[in-house]
Structures are given as C-alpha cells and as structure tokens.
Amino acid sequence: MSVQSAIRRKTAPDLRIRKNGEPIVMLTSYHAHTAALVDRHCDAILVGDSLGNVMHGFETTVPVTLEMMILQGCAVMRGSSQALVVVDMPFGSYEGSKEQAFQSAVRIMKETLCGAVKLEGGARMAETVAFLSERGIPVMGHIGLTPQSINTLGSFRAQGREEANWAPIENDARAIAEAGAFSIVIEAVAEPLARKITQSIAVPTIGIGASAACDGQILVLEDMLGLSPRSPKFVRRYGNLGPAIEEAIAGYARDVKSRAFPGPEHVYDMKKS
C-alpha cells in the first residue's frame, strides 16, 4: 500500500463531531497546487463559487456554472489527500426543486469524488437539505450574507446588526441544522448573533466575518495571502504575495529584454560523440 493511499481523508462526520471541540480550520482552493498546500494545514477545503470572482473576474458569483465547479473540484481533489473537500452548488443549480438539487449534487459528488456539497439559504432550503442528506449527500449550510442573493440584497452588507433582525437568521440556522446539515457557514453576521447561534445549535458553525466563538473559520485563500486587490473587513492578511509576485514577473521581464535569461545553465548543449 502506498503512503498516499494509507492516509485517511476527513469526512463530514469527522467535522460534525468537532462541535465545541478544537476549532475547524478551513480555506478555499480552486487549483491542485494550492490544494496541496492547504491540505497540510486545514481540516476542510471549500471549492467555493468565489472562483467566479477570484479566477474569472466576475463581479458576483451569479455567472458561475455547475461545470465550472466540477472542473475545479476535480483539480482540488487531485491536489489534496487529507482534508474534507466541499464543493459549492452554484446559483441556479438547486433552487428550482429538491429534485433539481439532488441531480446537481449527484453530478458534483460522482464527477469530483468530493466529500460534501454546500448550498446557500436558510429555512427555505431546509426541505432540500433534508432531501439530500437522506439520500447520502452531506450538506454544509450557508446563512447570513448569501452572495448568490446579491440581486435581491442589493449589496454585500453585514446581516443582523440590529437585534430586531435576529429572529429570521436564528430561524435559518435552526431549520438547516434540524434538516440534517452537518455544519453551517455563517457569513458577515453581527458577532453577538453569530455567538448566540453557535451556542444554540447542535452542529458546528464555521465563521467568515462572524465570531471567534464559531466552531471554525474559513477565508478565501487569495484574500488572506494578499493576492486580492480588495478584501472585506473580516479578512486578516497573513501574507502580501501580490507585490512579491509582481516583483518576480518584473525581474523576469527585465532579464528577457536584456538577454540575461536564459543563461548557459538553462539551455541544452549538443551531445558529445
């Protein structure tokens, strides 16, 4: 048996039992090479529909297709070996009916071999979450700020900053948890509300702009590496790779123009007879 095949990949139940335990570490990845790096340090990798913004330059995640998610999901699965890989269900692939959601989720699971899917929406998606969970598809929920709903929200603004608006968000979390989600992402929600939700539901919460009290945290990899031109308030930059990459490219361009690259060590001599 090879070393790689002996490594056990984390599963949705592994994350589920981390409620009130060691915080869950999660990042996004869309490529095999970044997945290999993330895999060494994270419990889970999200192949997020944020790839629409990060990889393709879309203003929102709305244009992202199922085929795009499957393609990058396959890449991340090939690059990783230990972390649970969760693939986002993109806008338009699951909202029509629970049957539509099932067909889309089956494609994702079969074609990428990932361990779970994620979908946005609260109480209105509870029936769908239950339908998928009962049929062997682990579902990660996503409440609070739901980027796929940008056209009805109007802007990417934090949710629940007035206590009068807490009840619907609390109901969303409760409904998704009771429907069978193994964990729930809470995005851009007022800290006291995120803390309250975490304390009141039985499944792990994973915060992004929520609370340190959540059972885990997730960020977009490119945001925390300093590769994104703009980052949300909730991002802490653990690197500043943008300028470093640009400096390397500029150095390459200088060497090509001056014929300093390639050097003798980079070219092939004739074989000696």
Swiss-Prot record:
Keyword terms of this UniProt record: Cytoplasm, Magnesium, Metal-binding, Pantothenate biosynthesis, Transferase
A GO CC annotation given for this chain: cytoplasm
Binding-site positions, 3-methyl-2-oxobutanoate: 49-50, 88, 118
Gene3D superfamilies (UniProt xref): Phosphoenolpyruvate-binding domains (3.20.20.60)
Subcellular location: Cytoplasm
GO BP annotations, alphabetical order: pantothenate biosynthetic process
Catalytic-site annotation from UniProt: 187 (proton acceptor)
HAMAP family in UniProt: PanB
Family under the similarity heading: Belongs to the PanB family.
Function text: Catalyzes the reversible reaction in which hydroxymethyl group from 5,10-methylenetetrahydrofolate is transferred onto alpha-ketoisovalerate to form ketopantoate.
UniProt-recorded name of the protein: 3-methyl-2-oxobutanoate hydroxymethyltransferase 3
Source organism (scientific name): Bradyrhizobium diazoefficiens (strain JCM 10833 / BCRC 13528 / IAM 13628 / NBRC 14792 / USDA 110)
Lineage, highest ranks first: Bacteria, Pseudomonadati, Pseudomonadota, Alphaproteobacteria, Hyphomicrobiales
